């Protein structure tokens, strides 16, 4: 199982989204909420209250 790159939630097989940047770094997201917060809004996970530690 993969974990979300933003909230560290486990992602089940066949769900979620993989985002690959031009530099080759790979991010896995469990929801569009996590994807938008990290990619579009540029938020840091440790500063967001709803993210698991």
Swiss-Prot record:
A zinc finger (C4-type) spans 4-34. The keyword Zinc-finger applies. One of its GO terms (biological process) is translation. One of its GO terms (molecular function) is structural constituent of ribosome. Keywords: Metal-binding, Ribonucleoprotein, Ribosomal protein, RNA-binding, rRNA-binding, Zinc, Zinc-finger. Zn(2+) binds at residues 4, 7, 30, 34. It comes from the Archaea. The keyword Transferase does not apply. InterPro entries: L24e/L24_sf, Ribosomal_eL24-rel_arc, Ribosomal_eL24-rel_N, TRASH_dom. Binds 1 zinc ion per subunit. GO terms for cellular component: ribonucleoprotein complex; ribosome. Its cofactor is Zn(2+). Pfam families: Ribosomal_L24e. Binds to the 23S rRNA. Part of the 50S ribosomal subunit. Forms a cluster with proteins L3 and L14. Belongs to the eukaryotic ribosomal protein eL24 family. This is Large ribosomal subunit protein eL24. It comes from Methanobrevibacter smithii (strain ATCC 35061 / DSM 861 / OCM 144 / PS). The gene is rpl24e.
